[in-house]
Amino acid sequence: MRKTFLTLLCVSSAIAHAADEDITFHGTLLSPPTCSISGGKTIEVEFRDLIIDDINGNYGRKEVPYELTCDSTTRHPDWEMTLTWTGTQTSFNDAAIETDVPGFGIELQHDGQRFKLNTPLAINATDFTQKPKLEAVPVKASDAVLSDTNFSAYATLRVDYQ
Protein backbone atom coordinates (compact mmCIF):
# COMPACT_ATOMS: atom_id res chain seq x y z
CA MET A 1 0.00 0.00 0.00
CA ARG A 2 2.86 2.32 0.81
CA LYS A 3 4.27 1.83 -2.74
CA THR A 4 0.95 2.76 -4.31
CA PHE A 5 0.67 5.92 -2.21
CA LEU A 6 4.24 6.95 -3.13
CA THR A 7 3.56 6.40 -6.84
CA LEU A 8 0.37 8.45 -6.65
CA LEU A 9 2.22 11.18 -4.80
CA CYS A 10 4.89 11.36 -7.55
CA VAL A 11 2.30 11.53 -10.33
CA SER A 12 0.32 14.17 -8.45
CA SER A 13 3.48 16.14 -7.88
CA ALA A 14 4.30 16.16 -11.62
CA ILE A 15 0.81 17.36 -12.51
CA ALA A 16 0.96 20.08 -9.92
CA HIS A 17 4.03 21.60 -11.59
CA ALA A 18 2.70 21.72 -15.19
CA ALA A 19 2.94 25.07 -17.00
CA ASP A 20 1.46 26.54 -20.16
CA GLU A 21 3.62 28.42 -22.63
CA ASP A 22 2.38 30.58 -25.48
CA ILE A 23 3.59 29.97 -29.03
CA THR A 24 3.92 32.80 -31.51
CA PHE A 25 3.98 32.19 -35.27
CA HIS A 26 5.11 34.83 -37.75
CA GLY A 27 6.50 35.14 -41.25
CA THR A 28 6.01 36.90 -44.56
CA LEU A 29 3.62 35.94 -47.33
CA LEU A 30 5.07 36.44 -50.81
CA SER A 31 3.37 36.22 -54.17
CA PRO A 32 5.37 35.45 -57.29
CA PRO A 33 5.94 38.66 -59.25
CA THR A 34 4.25 39.42 -62.55
CA CYS A 35 6.66 38.64 -65.37
CA SER A 36 6.66 39.38 -69.08
CA ILE A 37 8.48 38.39 -72.23
CA SER A 38 10.07 41.20 -74.25
CA GLY A 39 7.88 43.78 -72.55
CA GLY A 40 4.75 42.28 -74.09
CA LYS A 41 5.86 43.21 -77.62
CA THR A 42 5.66 40.85 -80.60
CA ILE A 43 8.94 39.01 -81.19
CA GLU A 44 9.91 39.10 -84.86
CA VAL A 45 12.07 36.40 -86.45
CA GLU A 46 12.98 37.20 -90.06
CA PHE A 47 14.24 34.27 -92.13
CA ARG A 48 14.61 36.21 -95.39
CA ASP A 49 15.26 33.94 -98.40
CA LEU A 50 15.54 30.19 -97.79
CA ILE A 51 16.72 27.72 -100.41
CA ILE A 52 14.01 25.04 -100.55
CA ASP A 53 16.38 22.12 -101.22
CA ASP A 54 18.53 23.05 -98.19
CA ILE A 55 15.70 22.88 -95.62
CA ASN A 56 16.79 19.95 -93.47
CA GLY A 57 15.95 20.83 -89.86
CA ASN A 58 19.23 22.66 -89.35
CA TYR A 59 19.55 25.07 -92.27
CA GLY A 60 18.22 28.59 -91.81
CA ARG A 61 18.42 28.51 -88.00
CA LYS A 62 17.62 31.92 -86.42
CA GLU A 63 17.92 33.01 -82.81
CA VAL A 64 14.66 34.12 -81.20
CA PRO A 65 15.49 37.40 -79.45
CA TYR A 66 13.55 37.61 -76.18
CA GLU A 67 13.98 39.13 -72.74
CA LEU A 68 12.43 38.08 -69.44
CA THR A 69 11.50 40.76 -66.92
CA CYS A 70 9.60 40.66 -63.65
CA ASP A 71 8.06 43.59 -61.76
CA SER A 72 9.96 42.70 -58.59
CA THR A 73 13.47 41.65 -57.73
CA THR A 74 12.05 39.26 -55.11
CA ARG A 75 12.89 35.73 -56.18
CA HIS A 76 12.40 32.63 -54.09
CA PRO A 77 14.34 29.48 -54.98
CA ASP A 78 11.25 27.31 -54.34
CA TRP A 79 9.22 29.17 -56.96
CA GLU A 80 9.15 27.55 -60.36
CA MET A 81 9.37 29.44 -63.63
CA THR A 82 8.51 27.84 -66.95
CA LEU A 83 8.40 28.80 -70.62
CA THR A 84 5.76 27.26 -72.87
CA TRP A 85 5.11 27.87 -76.53
CA THR A 86 1.82 27.23 -78.25
CA GLY A 87 0.55 27.26 -81.80
CA THR A 88 -0.93 24.95 -84.41
CA GLN A 89 1.30 21.87 -84.48
CA THR A 90 2.38 20.37 -87.80
CA SER A 91 1.34 16.79 -88.55
CA PHE A 92 4.97 15.78 -89.06
CA ASN A 93 6.83 17.36 -86.11
CA ASP A 94 5.59 17.77 -82.50
CA ALA A 95 8.01 20.66 -81.91
CA ALA A 96 6.98 22.66 -84.99
CA ILE A 97 4.12 24.98 -85.82
CA GLU A 98 2.36 25.13 -89.16
CA THR A 99 3.05 27.97 -91.55
CA ASP A 100 0.65 29.14 -94.23
CA VAL A 101 2.51 26.83 -96.65
CA PRO A 102 1.36 23.17 -96.47
CA GLY A 103 4.13 20.75 -95.45
CA PHE A 104 6.36 23.55 -94.14
CA GLY A 105 6.78 24.48 -90.47
CA ILE A 106 8.93 26.24 -87.92
CA GLU A 107 10.51 24.18 -85.13
CA LEU A 108 11.54 25.88 -81.90
CA GLN A 109 14.62 24.66 -80.05
CA HIS A 110 16.03 25.51 -76.62
CA ASP A 111 19.78 25.23 -76.22
CA GLY A 112 19.95 22.95 -79.27
CA GLN A 113 17.14 20.63 -78.09
CA ARG A 114 13.65 20.33 -79.59
CA PHE A 115 11.12 22.42 -77.62
CA LYS A 116 7.83 20.52 -77.88
CA LEU A 117 4.66 22.56 -78.22
CA ASN A 118 2.50 22.91 -75.09
CA THR A 119 5.26 21.40 -72.92
CA PRO A 120 6.50 23.63 -70.08
CA LEU A 121 10.26 24.09 -69.90
CA ALA A 122 11.63 24.75 -66.40
CA ILE A 123 13.99 27.71 -66.33
CA ASN A 124 16.12 29.41 -63.67
CA ALA A 125 13.81 31.77 -61.78
CA THR A 126 16.57 33.52 -59.86
CA ASP A 127 19.05 34.33 -62.64
CA PHE A 128 17.69 35.45 -66.02
CA THR A 129 21.20 35.49 -67.49
CA GLN A 130 20.82 31.70 -67.59
CA LYS A 131 17.64 31.78 -69.68
CA PRO A 132 17.52 29.20 -72.47
CA LYS A 133 18.74 30.17 -75.93
CA LEU A 134 15.76 29.84 -78.26
CA GLU A 135 16.19 29.21 -81.99
CA ALA A 136 13.66 28.83 -84.78
CA VAL A 137 14.47 26.28 -87.47
CA PRO A 138 12.61 25.77 -90.78
CA VAL A 139 11.40 22.18 -91.25
CA LYS A 140 9.43 20.39 -93.95
CA ALA A 141 7.50 17.16 -94.23
CA SER A 142 9.40 14.36 -95.97
CA ASP A 143 6.82 14.30 -98.78
CA ALA A 144 6.44 18.09 -99.07
CA VAL A 145 6.75 19.69 -102.49
CA LEU A 146 7.49 23.34 -101.82
CA SER A 147 7.57 26.12 -104.38
CA ASP A 148 8.72 29.74 -104.35
CA THR A 149 6.44 31.76 -102.08
CA ASN A 150 6.36 33.93 -98.99
CA PHE A 151 5.44 32.29 -95.69
CA SER A 152 4.42 33.27 -92.19
CA ALA A 153 3.58 31.52 -88.93
CA TYR A 154 2.32 32.63 -85.53
CA ALA A 155 2.93 31.22 -82.07
CA THR A 156 2.71 32.33 -78.45
CA LEU A 157 5.55 32.18 -75.93
CA ARG A 158 4.36 32.26 -72.31
CA VAL A 159 6.21 32.58 -69.01
CA ASP A 160 4.62 31.19 -65.84
CA TYR A 161 5.90 31.82 -62.34
CA GLN A 162 4.53 29.93 -59.35
Curated annotation (Swiss-Prot):
A cellular component term, taken from the record's GO annotations: pilus
Induction notes from the record: Expression is negatively regulated by H-NS and subjected to cAMP receptor protein (CRP)-mediated catabolite repression.
InterPro entries, sorted: Adhesion_dom_fimbrial, Adhesion_dom_fimbrial_sf, Adhesion_dom_sf, Bact_Fimbrial_Adh_Pro
Top-level taxon: Bacteria
Signal peptide: 1-18
GO BP terms, alphabetized: cell adhesion; cell adhesion involved in single-species biofilm formation
Deletion consequences: Deletion of the operon under classical laboratory conditions does not result in any major effect on E.coli capacity to form biofilms compared with the wild-type strain.
Keywords: Signal
Role this protein plays: Part of the yfcOPQRSUV fimbrial operon. Could contribute to adhesion to various surfaces in specific environmental niches. Increases adhesion to eukaryotic T24 bladder epithelial cells in the absence of fim genes.
Miscellaneous information on this protein: The operon is cryptic under classical laboratory conditions, but is functional when constitutively expressed.
Family as reported in the entry's similarity comment: Belongs to the fimbrial protein family.
Name of the protein this chain belongs to: Uncharacterized fimbrial-like protein YfcQ
Source organism: Escherichia coli (strain K12)
Organism ancestry: Bacteria, Pseudomonadati, Pseudomonadota, Gammaproteobacteria, Enterobacterales
Gene: yfcQ
